[in-house]
Amino acid sequence: MSTHGEPAEPIAKGIFATAKQSFGDLFRWKQRVEITNEYGESTYVWQAPPPLKNPISLFAQLSLTDWTFFLVGLLAWTADAFDFHALSIQTTKLAKYYDTSKTNITTAITLTLLLRSIGAAIFGLVADRYGRKWPLVVNMWILGILQIATIYAPTFGGFLGVRALFGLFMGGVYGSAIAMALENCPTEARGLMSGILQQGYSFGYVLAACANLGVGGSTNSYKTVFWIGAGLSIGVGCLRILFPESKQFIEAKRHKKEHPELHQNAGAGAFWADCKKMLVKEWRMCIYCIILMTWFNYYSHTSQDSYTTFLLTEKEFNNAQASRGSILMKTGACVGGTIIGYLSQWVGRRRAMIVSAFISCCLIPAWILPTTERSLSASGFFMQFFVQGAWGVIPIHLNELSPPAFRSSFPGVTYQIGNMISSPSAQIVNAVAESTFMTNFRNERVEAYGPTMGVATVIIALGIIVTTAPGPEKRGARFELAKIAGEGGSDDNLARKVADIERGNSVAEKGEARQLETINVDKA
């Protein structure tokens, strides 16, 4: 990127001043860039973002090793999503099996989401300290075992207990998977790869819906879907064993072996000291990301978890029709997340999220009012195109906002705390819909799932817009060379490659000058 441009004012200080500046930057096409020369002198300029690149050329930038890490991370996230949606799309079957209400069944979803933040903290910190490989392997194996335990839960109470424990281990997947996948991708390709990666969640839903369609609508058929989920999770864990640790941790171990004198303070104590320093420095960013993830998790769970139930009850579809509608809906999510994640590398992370959320609001009438399978499938496709389009930006956005040494725990914990806060979303939708009735197109009195989901989604989408507009953005931040947390803070070999990597700096060496560029380093 060129180091010349129109002079810009320095980054504002303070929460409100920074928010005001970030909001103003949203309406300027050029990016605010901080340029630091070899003497530590900084200037700020406006620069046009790099032109949008052909996605094929971006794919070509990834080496075979990069693709390996990315695909394993994608598969882990897909398996995690399959395990979660295996329950949400079979709410009606499970309610019949345990002879209880659909609202009571969604209590299991609430418990799963409540405990995911604890798992994210535990497995995220372990992954940041010891590496991405074995924490993810153990995590996936335990998820598979708990899927099997769900099948054999004899009572509703036992079912809830297993799903609560399931949530604890499910929480550890997201942070490790996206950190492993994106930290090994070239910077220019991260927007596109983020969009594809996030759609592992939607693809997991599609696979679960296909499995549900394949096993039929009988009550006991839900067990077959859980068996498939167990095999998928255990299989991904076994697959991860075949590949090495992330290169950052291999490099750190090599450097520690060659220069033990530089790592005398490394260890658990140094790791926790780094954690405390990070929290003191980044607590505002942490709170912002939790608020953002709360909105986003409400956004996805409200618009999708009860969608199959909506088709079955309000629209009176049969199991096959509802499954086909759900599959097409999440196919739209896969397409939208990939395209909008890719575009975010050019138009900006915040603009991509805001425009997607706004368009999804406009589509709500078309999403809930039609009565035929074709119409609802088409509107569901485009609704989730933009819902998950906004979501497609999240993996790279969270990684760029994260302290670089905590790229597994920070995104994982903030995402899962947002999940925890939004955990009652499906339960709220079901409770309101089951207690509110409307007359459908056949003049029959039915539960009002459509209006409930529509009103809630409008409120949530507007919340996303209001939260994102004044928020921070670090598009283009380079975090792949960050020092490993707990390594004593003396790894000069790595540290000298980046001046202040937590502010999103990248290194550009041109001629005799070494210039350090920071893109959109707005603070939370």
What are the residue ranges of the model-derived segments?
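Extracytoplasmic gate region of multi-pass secondary transporters
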Residues: 87-88, 282-337, 422-426
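Central mid-sequence intracellular linker of multi-pass
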Residues: 190-192, 197, 216-280, 410, ...
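Cytosolic juxtamembrane N-terminal segment immediately preceding the first transmembrane helix
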Residues: 2-89, 96
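Helix-breaking motifs and short loop linkers at transmembrane-helix boundaries and internal kinks
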Residues: 99, 131, 152-158, 186, ...
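Residue-level signature of mid-helix packing/kink "hotspots" within the transmembrane helices
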Residues: 85, 113-121, 206, 330-338, ...
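C-terminal ends and interior cores of transmembrane alpha-helices
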Residues: 141-154, 358-372
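Conserved MFS/SLC helix-loop-helix module at the cytosolic interface between two early adjacent transmembrane helices
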Residues: 118-156, 347
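Glycine-rich segments within core transmembrane alpha-helices of 12-TM secondary carriers
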Residues: 189-217, 232-233, 412-426
